[in-house]
Amino acid sequence: MVSNTIRVAVGILGNAASMLLYAAPILTFRRVIKKGSVEEFSCVPYILALFNCLLYTWYGLPVVSSGWENSTVSSINGLGILLEIAFISIYTWFAPRERKKFVLRMVLPVLAFFALTAIFSSFLFHTHGLRKVFVGSIGLVASISMYSSPMVAAKQVITTKSVEFMPFYLSLFSFLSSALWMIYGLLGKDLFIASPNFIGCPMGILQLVLYCIYRKSHKEAEKLHDIDQENGLKVVTTHEKITGREPEAQRD
């Protein structure tokens, strides 16, 4: 009874951390909307997150799990579905044509695969145990893919020595969410919840370490950019004062 109470408490904390994780890209997409461009941001993590949320929402429902034993899992992933759909929609709206096509080529198979998973688990397996194994195994692979996708951003950080496209809060909440859900899964002896988070934890730690290493380089680059802009403004202003007119555009 006590262990179940602790598990529920950890699940609630996991829900809170996951909510922050799913909501963290809001800052990124505010920037996308403001600039009217997706810049170098990738949509792959959001598509993989959508697939993961679909699977674990289904996993937590009474169709797969026994009763509402995993209600916290289905509730937070249900919210995740709504947020990921919103992010993917915004990304698609502001993305160039080729990236729009790429998003569609990824999203449609994801939705089709989830539909097949739901149908097969409902009609081919007749016990909760078998359904959990089937859906959980697919969810395990999806979670590993989701937690591995930020490694693309990590590689970019190492290459460019800039954390511009790897937001700090996304890395922090990813680590906290993974740690809490790993504990939740272990307390309930549910390896399909605990296992993927064994991978998510070190991935989150790695991102935080990279952020600590390269954040100074990013700040210094921003300062140099500001100084260059300021110096450019001073040169133009001085030219105007001396000549009494704006500088002519450079000829080809």
Swiss-Prot record:
One of its GO terms (biological process) is carbohydrate transport. Pfam families: MtN3_slv. The chain crosses the membrane at residues 9-29, 44-64, 76-96, 106-126, 133-153, 168-188, 191-211. Keywords: Cell membrane, Glycoprotein, Membrane, Repeat, Sugar transport, Transmembrane, Transmembrane helix, Transport. Residues 10-98, 134-219 form the MtN3/slv domain. GO terms for molecular function: sugar transmembrane transporter activity. The keyword ATP-binding does not apply. Residues 1-8, 65-75, 127-132, 189-190 are extracellular. It is found in: Cell membrane. Belongs to the SWEET sugar transporter family. This is Bidirectional sugar transporter SWEET3b. The gene is SWEET3B.
